[in-house]
C-alpha cells in the first residue's frame, strides 16, 4: 500500500514540476516584424526603433543582436527584461554605395525556449541623389 502512495506522490510531483517548467519561461515578441523605409536617398542613414517585449513569466535575456549585412547596425536598449518589460531595438541602415531595392534581416538571439532566434526585416529603395533631385523638380512642376 505504501508503494502505491509513493508512486502516486511521485507522479503528481513530476507533473507539477513539468508543468512549472513549461509555463514559467520567457516569451519574446517584437513589433513591428517588418518595416519599409520607402525611398532612401543614396549615402544617407536611416533609423527605425523596433520594440521587443517579454510576455513570459521569467526573465528574458537578449544574448546577441546582429544584422544580415555590415551596412546595418543594431543596438538593444537592455539585455535583460523582466516579465511584461520591453526595450527598444535601434536599427540603423547606412545606404552608402547602395542602389535599388534593399532587403535586410535583423536577428535577435534570446533565451526564449520556443523562439530562440527572432528574425525581423526591413526594406527600402535606395535612389541616387541626382534622381531624387530630379523627382523633386518634376513634382514641383505639377
PLM feature segments, named:
Residues 23-45, 49-51, 55, 113-142:
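Long, low-complexity ectodomains and other extracytoplasmic segments of secretory-pathway proteins
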Residues 48-54, 91, 104-109:
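Buried hydrophobic-core signal for structured, non-transmembrane domains
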Amino acid at each position: 500500500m505504501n508503494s502505491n502512495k509513493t508512486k502516486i506522490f511521485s507522479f503528481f510531483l513530476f507533473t507539477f514540476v513539468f508543468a512549472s517548467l513549461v509555463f514559467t519561461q520567457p516569451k519574446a515578441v517584437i513589433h513591428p516584424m517588418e518595416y519599409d523605409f520607402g525611398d532612401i536617398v543614396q549615402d544617407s542613414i536611416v533609423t527605425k526603433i523596433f520594440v521587443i517585449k517579454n510576455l513570459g513569466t521569467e526573465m528574458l535575456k537578449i544574448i546577441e543582436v546582429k544584422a544580415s549585412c555590415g551596412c546595418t547596425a543594431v543596438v538593444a536598449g537592455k539585455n535583460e527584461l523582466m516579465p511584461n518589460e520591453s526595450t527598444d531595438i535601434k536599427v540603423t541602415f547606412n545606404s552608402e554605395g547602395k542602389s535599388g531595392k534593399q532587403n535586410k534581416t535583423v536577428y535577435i538571439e534570446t533565451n526564449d525556449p520556443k523562439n530562440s532566434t527572432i528574425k525581423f526585416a526591413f526594406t527600402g529603395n535606395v535612389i541616387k541623389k541626382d534622381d531624387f533631385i530630379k523627382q523633386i523638380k518634376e513634382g514641383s512642376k505639377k
